[in-house]
Amino acid sequence: DLAHEENADKVTEDHVRRGRELLQREEVTQGIHGLNEHEQILLYALASYSSDDLSPVRSRDLYHRYEQFCSHSGLDALTSRWMHDHIDELEMLGLVSVDKKNKGSSGGQYKVIGLDQELLAVLNALEDTINQVGVHESVQTKLTEL
């Protein structure tokens, strides 16, 4: 389709690469739109850390920002147990990556979570959520790139 739109005589490797990137962004957008409101807010919280290059982030820090975003949008935050369950779901969807850390008996076990998709594609797909919650200062400059 890209080659046709550009009136190219033949399909090049660049057309194929850009076509794949476009399809991947569309799949990410569809996947995010299929999430419920709380899952989208959770993903937005993670994206805000990624915008500040603070990702991957510990699950407890992510939960704190998720609570803040819920408060901004007038929703009651769900439990941290809920968040852990849904982080696993977001990982299965390929939206986030999870690394389990074990610091032994003194440090305990915890998860660090990172965004596993292109930040701008995620922010674009979360446009309605961002409008509902408000624009976090960490993503303000990224949104101007959209």
PLM feature spans:
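C-terminal helical "lid" subdomain and adjoining coupling/linker elements of P-loop NTPases
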Residues: 1-38, 53-55, 73-79, 97, ...
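Short, locally clustered residues in the helix-turn-helix/winged-helix DNA-binding domain
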Residues: 4, 44-51, 67
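Short alpha-helical interface patches
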Residues: 13-24, 38, 42, 91, ...
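Hydrophobic residues on short alpha-helical segments
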Residues: 39-47, 63, 84
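Terminal-proximal interaction/regulatory segments of ATP-powered molecular machines
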Residues: 53-146
